[in-house]
């Protein structure tokens, strides 16, 4: 009789793909099937994030709830980035946890579920970490890792300590996975890496040397692939070749994530980001010039240690000049093992909160203007989700969330939609064809 697996995923798209890898491994080798019912689960997993302090606190509140809800004999496992940096401390704080797997150790999940108090948190450079069977959370798109880890060592970021140095996955393995996904019906390919456009700088062995721009072209040539998305690129590596291929290739979706973090050059230097305010503005302007329909999203940290009022105003200036379609903004959160956590000039909570509120309020005003301008336009929308209110939703080519009245027969299809109404985060429309 098949065993039941319940899995909760916190954090980024990399974690989503790691969870898909875990599900594939357990279903193929250990006869587990996925369940959404916690109470019937034989195995309960939480795949964790540690990029800020809040998700770490959430881990322990969640596993505490799992311990109360689990049926007799059910096992609880903690995976992901928090597992990497806390290690066996998780057992001390939550003794009912049965095993701990770091972010670079998910290939050991079969061993973990069969071994009492199993723990593995070392940085694994073995190619087994990305040679998993196929499982997709959505039949209409496929998340595919092209690299693992990060070399940037930004002073605020824990990721290099939890996911290790950057290793590119060989192009032949990526293309094989793309072909498999397309054959199985995924028309959209979503490429993942901490710095995707740094792809090709280091492999774990002797492999074909290829950069990210050329990899995008190769993937676009795979039969059945209609759309390509990726996250996250680094502004430092947005050279003209990359921007040209992004702008001109008809299969690459016209949405670009450009993580700003700060609009002040001094703060960027202390963050160890490697670029200046002027470089970022130049790349954003070049992108909008080459690709007028592009939507640009970004990450912003306010109240980085030592950030003055004037330096924060530089961030507001970039917000005004680029007019991002979407921002992911947070107060600086000190992380263990990072340089910035040792800085003595931390910003007080009141100042940090005020800056975040101002940033988000102004962006909401910008977003309202951007969204209102979509009304009356006809957008190509790839439908992939049934909504609870009875509609069908998908993403436009430039990443707007669009909803229409319809049924599941629309899923997996790209159709033209005329936008008839707008809300801050959703466009509403009717089929134009």
From Swiss-Prot:
The keyword Metal-binding applies. GO terms for cellular component: cytosol. [4Fe-4S] cluster 1 binds at residues 12, 49, 81. Its cofactor is [4Fe-4S] cluster. NCBIfam families: miaB-methiolase, MiaB/RimO family radical SAM methylthiotransferase. Belongs to the methylthiotransferase family. MiaB subfamily. This is tRNA-2-methylthio-N(6)-dimethylallyladenosine synthase. The gene is miaB.
